[in-house]
Amino acid sequence: MLNRFNSLPLIIASLTLTACVSVDSKREDVSNALHDVKEPESCQAITVVNNKDIHEQGLNPENIALLNWNLYKGNNDGWQKDLSSFAQSHDVMTIQEAYLDDKLSGLLQTNNFNWTMNTAFHLNGTAAGVMTVANSKAIQSCGFQNIEPIIRVPKATLVSYYNIDGHDRKLLVANIHGINFTLGVTAYQEQLAQLYDSIQHHDGPMIVAGDFNTWSDDRMAEVMQLVEKLSMSSLEYRVNNKTHVFGNAIDHVFYRQLQPVSKKVWQVSSSDHNPISVTFKLKPEARLIAVREIPEACADSC
């Protein structure tokens, strides 16, 4: 990961890379192995899933195993084996730098995964962005993009909702790839503010995970403000193998109304990020909170 932070030479190289990158005027949401392509809902106009009559199988409230991993676009050897292995023991996987080439597409189809992708851009004609994979279908998803102010390449965020077996509450899972190359924190603040606006209405259990690119104290302070506003908690590790840049961890999992049962950071060579694994169970008090009614999203004025 440190090789991405060689300052000026890296920025020049990144600007050159944009010649191969195409940025669409609209977001693309590619979901499940059928490869249906549609424009996702705006997170600012999302209809809260409480109002949808969707009866998908839910997650087990006693065991929700999450893996968060930046896949490095599959540039390193061994990622397919590692991803397939992790998928067998996790219920939800939040993936950043997913590169939907034939290798990843084939892996998703072979394993019959349920997945949703919010495309940030196309690299050499192939979609790249954030992807959330689960053993249950997302009952609703929305996404947005934020442009890197220096290299002008988008970063994507995806918000997905899942049923929880035996409960009216829905689990919100937000998957974010944080803006990276900035001289200050203004653009970073704007991305986090958009995420907050997109999910602050949800009063149920919540996971916010991703590659936050918190390589400075100022960036981490912005993230912790978001965490505090959402009444979320962070994970502490006795053995911290999380990927660090400039001495700061950049990948994080935050949660609410869930209780961590176990957690681990895996050491891998198949990406420049080490995956974070955590198993949650639904807190008892989260099961007793009444479902708040949210009006349907408006068609024109939102």
Roles of regions detected by a PLM:
Residues 63-71, 81-106, 172-176, 195-220, ...:
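Active-site beta-strand/loop signature of hydrolases that rely on acidic residues for catalysis
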Residues 30-53, 92, 96-170, 266-267:
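Structured beta-strand-rich core segments of catalytic domains in phosphoester-bond hydrolases
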